[in-house]
Amino acid sequence: MRLILPADTEGIFLERKSRFTGVALVEGKKTLIHIHNTGRLPLLKKGKRVLLKRAESDRRKTGWDLLAVEHRDEFVFVHSGFHSIVAGKILEELFPGSTIESEKRFENSRFDFLIDRRTFVEVKGCTYEEDGVAMFPDAPTERGRRHIEELISSVKSGFKALLLILVFLESDCFLPNRNVDPAFSRVFWRALKSGVNIDVFRVKYDGEYLCSTEKLSICEEV
């Protein structure tokens, strides 16, 4: 999978003002930027280099969208608004020739995709790691837990289900973050035992392209 998404400029992150806004030094000026990610984003710290895309609308209070933040030797893509686009490209490669529909409802949830009217797909983006282990979530997520419970329910109803996890930073394997959200971790392992397929893909960003480079394994829980 390769998706072109060039950043328009680079800045220096200064502070997070609210859930969706932050301040960065852009072209020598303190500038309000939009953060399209509801997670805590622990890697978003003062002084980090960030990649930004100019907002398409001049009516917004924030003139720039945060795309990626510097972390060690790479830029980590953090704009969750592109998760479905990236996932859709990956699914086209995983299921060639299949009919892929987006935003399909099942019971009380709306899943990201439905493949050939029989496989529900939910997508999660991961931007946090510890000691080479990618972890999701980085903040408690009632919505995320509910989505996985509904995937389990869909399997019981005769459908197939896939949890597709996109890991945007260098990692060796993936684990649910039980320290941050024990309930999510429990339902994650229950989903595996209940027949929900879980695929984890590493996605890199170089300021020009988003590329899925490899499939990661699920770590053994300690």
From Swiss-Prot:
> In the record, what terms sit under GO molecular function?
DNA binding
Pfam families the record matches: SfsA (PF03749), SfsA_N (PF17746)
User: Membrane-spanning regions, if any?
Assistant: none
Superkingdom of this entry's organism? Bacteria
* Stated family: Belongs to the SfsA family.
Protein name from the UniProt record? Sugar fermentation stimulation protein homolog
Top-level taxonomy = Bacteria, Thermotogati, Thermotogota, Thermotogae, Thermotogales
